Structure formats: C-alpha cells, structure tokens
Curated annotation (Swiss-Prot):
Name used for this protein in its record: Chorismate synthase
Cofactor(s) the protein requires to work: FMNH2
A single GO BP: chorismate biosynthetic process
Family statement: Belongs to the chorismate synthase family.
Subunit structure comment from the entry: Homotetramer.
The enzyme's E.C. designation: 4.2.3.5
InterPro entries (UniProt xref): Chorismate_synth (IPR000453), Chorismate_synth_AroC_sf (IPR035904), Chorismate_synthase_CS (IPR020541)
Source organism, top-level taxon: Bacteria
Cofactor note: Reduced FMN (FMNH(2)).
SUPFAM superfamilies per record: Chorismate synthase, AroC (SSF103263)
Pfam families cross-referenced by the UniProt entry: Chorismate_synt
C-alpha cells in the first residue's frame, strides 16, 4: 500500500512533488454521464492558486489543468465515460536553489526528519511530496466530486486567524467572491483587521495559523454507515490529510463536552415537507455516522507554517546541532489557501458516500 489514494468508490490517487515537472491525479469510480466544463475545474483551482496577493506565497503557478482521459466532448461540455479521469498540472515556477542549505538539515516543525526516518531519503526541494503544492490536485478532484451529489453545495470560510476572529453576526457567503477579500472571510468587517495583523506577521518573517469552517448543504439523509464507515469519520480523515491540519471537529465539536445533554441534543418536529425539522444543528448534520439532511458543518485547525525567517535550533542528518532559517517563498498563513482545499476534501468524502449509499440501498 502506497497510501497515495483515498476514497472507496470515488477514488482519488494523487502524484507528483513540489519541484517536479508536474503534479496530477487520477479519479477512478466517477460515474458515466456527469457533465462539466474544464472552466469549472479551473475556477476552483484559481481560488487556491498561489501568488494572488501579498498574503500568500509569491510562487507564480498558473495551475492550468489538462484533462487527459475519462471524458468525451458533448457539445459545449465534457461528459464522463466511467473510465479513470486523469488530470495534470505543470509546475512552472520552481526555485530549488532556495532550498540548498536545508538539504542536510532538518527544519523544525516540518516533515523532513520523519520522511528521512521512514524512507531513508527525502526530497528537500520545497518539501517534495509533503508540500501543499500537491493539494492542487485534490482541488481538481473535488471540483468533479461536487457534480456527483445532485443539489449539493459545499462552501468554506476562514473564521479565525491567529488570535483574530470574525464576527459571525456579519456572516455573508456572497462576500467570499468579493475581489477585495483575499482571506475567504465571510465577515466584510474583518478584512482590514486580518490585513493589518498578517502584514505585521509577514514583515516579522513569521507565520500564523487559522481555523476554517466548511458547510455542505443539500446533502440527503442516510449517507454513511455504522460502525466503521461513518461519514464524519471519513470527512475527518480527509481533512486531517491536508498539510498542516492539526485538529478537526464536526458540528459544535469540542464545545459539546462543556454543555449538558439537554443543550446538546438537536430536538425535532414534523416538517411541512414530510421530513423531520431539526430545531438546532449541534451535531453538524451527522448522527451515528449518518447524514441527517441538515447542513454538514466541519471545522479544521491549521498550524502556523514552520517556514519562517526566525533562526530555529535543529540538527542535521549526522546529528550535529545547527540553526535553520527557511528561505524561499512561503505563505505567512497557509490557512487562507486551505479553504478551497477543505471544500474539495469534504466534497470528495460526501460524493464517495453518496455512491456507496446508492450501491448498498439502491437509493440516490
């Protein structure tokens, strides 16, 4: 097992390294007859693309996707054929020379030591396979996953950065698409505060973490299976696989441990449409590992990147004690570009469970 594949029926295999000639993915299990355009895939990639503001890495990658297999032209759109869909993204702005000094040194907080401990060799150029560069391929796969579940909408937002938090009373999904919003924040009033805060962090050569919230609406009840195929289990696994993610919660998550049962349990009434009407959504749209039909809500915490200009104590491959300064082009807050990545990983998990549910029950 190489552990480069996730999903059961909607299976995604990614390949490539940060400073290799290209990265890509193969999506296997996508049903035939799904219509989409290459522009739709590209639009999601453009949201994750580096170099779009002073608040993210200045590496200039166009991230232009090439779809190599698994589709046919059908008028103005492409249609899936049911065979593996292969997508490729070329790397065009690598600067491997920036990493020469850390070829033999372990960067604190990075996967340098653990990759060496496991494989006995590591690609020091931009982190190789452990780089978030790989996540562009997940976003491409996620754009396809959005097409699998009819009526599903998956959106994400950055809700805190370091010690700064949004005001949820100002939440506006439409503001995410505003050209004056480089942070994927749903709170228009938070932009200037985030900008001033991150400018200070960036100029100090440091970094900061963030919390991202993902909301999936239009997900039917019944997806997921006990006990070892829970929907929230796979959502958490997908989100935890993203670089720098150190925690995931569903619904109110850890807050549930601080309240009483009568506060936590989502009460129900009969709805006018014949379906239950929940009076709250503390469970985040999942009970017993199975979707309730309410919006699925997940949050994940992203640590500050360890690629900073502050000298840090470490060792080299021979065990000698050294100081490490990480040069190159890095995000002062990797949480910003993690928003579309989180959306993609949640979309992939739900699409996979939708196909599994349809196969098991005949419902879809």
């Amino acid at each position: 097992m190489s552990h480069n594949t996730f999903g059961h029926l909607f299976r995604v295999t990614t390949w490539g390294e940060s400073h290799g000639p290209a990265i890509g993915c193969v999506v296997d299990g996508c049903p035939p007859g799904i219509h989409f355009t290459q522009a739709e895939i590209q639009a999601d990639l453009d949201r994750r693309r580096p170099g779009q503001s002073r608040f993210v890495t200045q590496r200039r990658e166009p991230d232009e996707v090439k779809i190599l297999s698994g589709v046919m032209q059908d008028g103005e759109t492409l249609v899936t054929t049911g065979t593996p869909i292969s997508m490729l993204i070329e790397n065009v702005d690598q600067r491997s020379k920036d990493y020469g000094e850390i070829a033999e040194r372990y960067r604190p907080g990075h996967a340098d030591y653990t990759y060496d401990a496991k494989y006995g060799v590591r690609d020091y150029r931009g982190g190789g396979r452990s780089s978030a560069r790989e996540t562009a391929t997940r976003v491409a796969a996620g754009a396809l996953a959005r097409k699998i579940v009819p009526g599903m909408v998956v959106r994400g937002a950055l809700i805190s950065m370091g010690e700064k938090e949004i005001d949820r009373a100002n939440w506006d999904w439409d503001f995410l698409h505003d050209p004056e919003n480089p942070f994927f924040t749903p709170d228009p009033k938070s932009v200037s505060e985030f900008a001033d805060y991150l400018d200070g962090v960036r100029k100090a050569g440091s970094s900061v973490g963030a919390v991202i919230e993902i909301v999936a609406e239009g997900v039917p009840a019944g997806l997921g299976a006990p006990l070892y195929g829970k929907l929230d289990q796979d959502i958490c696994a997908n989100l935890m696989s993203i670089n720098a993610v150190k925690g995931v919660e569903i619904g109110i998550g850890f807050q549930a441990a601080r309240i009483h049962g009568e506060e936590n349990a989502d009460e129900m009434r009969s709805g006018n449409d014949g379906y239950p009407r929940f009076l709250s959504n503390n469970a985040g749209g999942i009970l017993g590992g199975i979707s309730t039909g309410q919006p699925i809500i997940a949050r994940f915490a992203v640590k500050p990147t360890s690629s900073i200009l502050t000298p840090r104590r470490s060792i080299d491959r021979k065990g000698a004690e050294v100081e490490v300064v990480t040069k190159g082009r890095h995000d002062p807050c990797v949480g910003i570009r993690a928003v579309p990545i989180g959306e993609a990983m949640v979309a992939c998990a739900i699409a996979d469970h939708y196909l599994r549910h349809r196969g098991q029950t005949g419902k879809g």
